[in-house]
Amino acid sequence: MAEFIGSIDQGTTSSRFLIFNKAGEPVASHQEEFSQIYPQPGWHEHDPEEIVSSVHNCIEGAVEAFKKDGNSVDSIKAIGITNQRETTVVWDIESGEALYNAIVWTDTRSQHIVKELKSRKGADELTQKCGLPLSTYPSVTKLLWLLKNEPRVKEAYEKGTLAFGTIDAWLVYKLNGHEKRVFVSDPTNASRTMFMDIHTLKYNPELIAFFGDEEFDLSRIHMPDIVKSSDAKAYGTIGSGVLSGFSLTGCLGDQSAALVGQKGFDAGSAKNTYGTGSFILYNTGNKPVISTHGLLTTVAYDFDGTPSYALEGSIAVAGSGVKFLMNNLGFSFDSSKITELAGTVENNGGLVFVTAFSGLFAPYWITDTQGTIFGITQHTQRGHIARATLEAVCYQTKAVLDAMEKDSGHPLQELKVDGGMSNSELCMQIQADILAENKIPIVRPKMRETTALGAAIAAGFAAGVWKNFEELKEVNTVGETVFEAKMEAKDSAKGIKRWERAVNMCRGWLVDDE
């Protein structure tokens, strides 16, 4: 009998359930969007119960389609989970009831808490311990806001029944049934809380103590056990529905899942997801590397008790730059037309578009600038601006990868790509040309559901569907496209130099003119 693996893909705007065969091909799927709640500017919430319901609905829908195609449900050997990271849920450990909406990873309401934490003694040592800098992104500041502002959360804390977790922990807890108390999280998610020691993959009492105060001793809060990303028993079984009794055997945060789905198992392997923004993960091997360029240190995966680590960097404007041309400048109503427009010119005509709409992330970390276009002449056409918009993403990707290579000590081996912008042949060729001096291939799989596939791989590995990493490397290889540089490295270097000059020239634009 053929073997299949289910994958729960719980994202920021929708939930999905996909069923993959052993070759990594999706054979059935179902998707459901859920409510986005914005109570105030900068606040972003989800209803935790609606998320669970959406996951159940997706499982039912995908399995129904799977059965209609003549497949047996019993051929599904394992189920994995991948999820939006950092999003924070608090609930009562006894009743299983959520005490407040989930605070989403994009939420910035805890800025004042971050400012206060940065003033505490030992704040400058946090990154060395947990891999993350203090910001509004990690789960800890969301938890602190809830403790200080929501009476039901404080009441549960005082009763000793307050449970805290990221979306993976909440889903596992609820899918099993709260009475079973299966309360676990994998290291790729636990590493985003700032409570986990990046070196030991265990909760660090010093970190937990740092974030507490006279009113709240965070060690009293119930936190999930940290277990391997791929484990045949730790995640329990689904307690109800069409897959009741089926085992949950793997879990990965979304960006780590994408790296696994791209089979980035070797040190020096990198993946870039070109979405609204871009998320780059770079495998650094079996030891965590603390960046000197402001990159994040995270866990790539832990399948067998020997974790692999990654450096993570992000680019704020990728696909959103294309949308800017469409919505703000009226270039087109179709994103594919933007890349066609970029292809109407042979080069950028000397034009550079630094798409720093809200500053630039690593390795630049420039906050005192805005989007800037250099090199406009009377010969500039819309195609030049469109091409420069694509190039901006590719130049920033080059800068992030170079910083990762320097930090890690592992030469860049390859770049695996996915996400909406990777559909553009032109954009991927531009990326290959900009990386000419690195002499590495850019590999784009035909099947680009790599995040969901990563969760399926984690689950299937624990269930014995795949026996080793060599077998996994053969998954999802059919029809992949390889892009290699067509430009000479010396010519590529000229464009990189011009880009870096433009970045430096736009520093300091945001100043007080009064």
Predicted regions and their residues:
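Conserved ATP-utilizing enzyme core subdomain
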Residues: 15-18, 169, 173-182, 323, ...
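Short beta-strand-loop/turn "lid" adjacent to the catalytic site in phosphate-handling enzymes
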Residues: 66-104, 133-137, 172-197, 227-228, ...
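ATP-dependent carbohydrate kinase catalytic cores
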Residues: 189-306, 310, 316-321, 326, ...
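Acidic, glycine/GT-rich loop-and beta-edge segments that sit at the periphery of enzyme/chaperone cores
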Residues: 321, 462-514
